[in-house]
Structures are given as C-alpha cells and as structure tokens.
C-alpha cells in the first residue's frame, strides 16, 4: 500500500540487508494480525471452498478428517490448486484455531534468508542482524505453520526441519541452546518428492515425517463441472466490490472457458 523506505545508488549491503529485514518483519507482522473470529471462520472454513466435483469433494473429506488430528499434512498438486486455502481450512477447523496460522513460500527466499525467517536469529549472528528476530516457528507456537513449496527448501534446512518434527525443538541462528515449540506443520509442494529423493534433492526421512497424511488437490481441468460455479462466484464478488448490480454469465462464455 505504499513505500516502506528507500535506498540510493551506492548504498552497500550493510544498509540494504537490515532495511529488507525490517520491511519483511513488518509485512509478516501485518500478515498474522488477528481478524474478527466470525469473519476468519467464514473465510477459511471448508464451506468457503467452492466446488462440487468428485475429486474436490474427496479432497475436502480427507482434509476435514485430518483437521481434528494433530499430525503433519502434506498437500500436493499443481500451482493454483488451492493448497494454502486447504491449509487454512485445516487450521481453522482444528483444535489449534486459537493460535496463529503463519505461512511462507520456501521458493521465495535464499537458503540464508529462509533459515532466518523460519527459525529466527540472535542479534550479531551475521552481517545485518542488528537485533533479535522471532522466527515463524515462534510465531506459530500453539498454532500451525504452513510451508509452501517445501520441495524448494535447501537440503541443509531440511535437516533442521526434521529435528523439529522429531524432537519439537530447533536452534535459532547464533544460539546454541534449543528452543521448544508446539506447532503443527502443514507442507505443500507441486513437485514429485519421490523423484526429488531419488535425485538427492530431498531427504527421504523428512518426506515420511511430513507425509503422515497426504492429500492431492486436483487441477481445474480435471473438474470442469466446477468452472461455472467458480466463475459465477468470482463475478458476484467483483460486482459487490465495484458496487455494481449482480451480473450473469452466459453459457457461451462458460463453454469457452
């Protein structure tokens, strides 16, 4: 919604890196602010997931089943199939729904930044670490952490994540003492993780820990019967936002889609 700060030509990393860290911290803090409980439940419940096709309803049924447990969940499917929507619904219909739901896309960060974002760091632990920083695991304590595109995570960080799953502990960058955490992990990927394991890019032990309960989300091309329902819902939502009267969608337009 605007500029956070600015840099000038010639600024070095000693200024740029802390500035980026502060901007990311503010964005993340804004992202975990609590919404009104009623609004949150309506927006993120399974009832908000639109579709009537058999593959989608089967995925929803599985997700409802696992929501009442506390086991890790692995969501698989192509980009755009709604993996984060499912993760939010699982969280908000679980016993952890009073805690935070925090999410991160593992493909959006370098290994070093991703480690800092997830596990946090102590001041002075590396260049630009001017103050202590909470990691997402700390933010998600007693709640749920969603690790999107887990297949992009560096193999070194996979070992730290495995430790959390095995012991409920992690070590911040710059610390030697482990921190205990009570958090549910939901991961998602658009990759074929068994193939990544064979290629040496993903840990087999981590895969089995994450995939205690695995749900595959079908792409829209495999559920064409949902196209009209989704289109009408999007048109209705846009009409309300633009304060227009409700619009209808022609059969010819749906057939084209």
Where are these regions (language model features)?
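Flexible nucleotide-interacting loop at or near the entrance of a catalytic core
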Residues: 9-78
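Conserved RecA-like P-loop NTPase ATPase core
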Residues: 36, 59, 81, 104, ...
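Conserved two-component signaling phosphotransfer/partner-docking surface
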Residues: 8-17, 22, 111, 115, ...
């Amino acid at each position: 919604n605007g500029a956070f700060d600015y840099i000038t030509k010639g600024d070095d990393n000693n200024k740029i890196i802390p500035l980026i860290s502060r901007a990311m911290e503010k964005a993340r803090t804004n992202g975990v602010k609590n919404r009104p409980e009623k609004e949150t439940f309506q927006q993120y419940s399974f009832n908000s997931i639109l579709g009537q096709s058999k593959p989608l309803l089967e995925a929803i049924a599985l997700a409802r089943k696992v929501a009442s447990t506390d086991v890790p969940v692995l969501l698989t499917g192509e980009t755009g199939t709604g993996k984060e929507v499912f993760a939010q619904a699982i969280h908000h219909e679980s016993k952890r729904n009073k805690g935070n739901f925090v999410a991160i896309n593992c493909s959006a960060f370098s290994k070093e930044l991703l480690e800092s974002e997830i596990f946090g760091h102590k001041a002075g632990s590396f260049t630009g670490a001017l103050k202590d920083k909470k990691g997402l695991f700390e933010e998600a304590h007693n709640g749920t952490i969603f690790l999107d595109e887990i297949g992009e995570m560096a193999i070194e960080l996979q070992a730290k994540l495995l430790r959390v799953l095995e012991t409920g502990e992690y070590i911040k960058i710059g610390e030697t003492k482990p921190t205990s955490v009570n958090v549910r992990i939901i991961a998602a990927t658009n990759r074929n993780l068994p193939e990544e394991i064979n290629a040496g890019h993903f840990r087999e032990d981590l895969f089995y820990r994450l995939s205690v309960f695995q749900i595959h989300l079908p792409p829209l091309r495999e559920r064409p019967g949902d196209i009209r329902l989704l289109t009408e819902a999007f048109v209705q939502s846009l009409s309300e936002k633009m304060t227009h009267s409700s619009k209808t969608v022609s059969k010819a337009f749906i057939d084209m889609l």
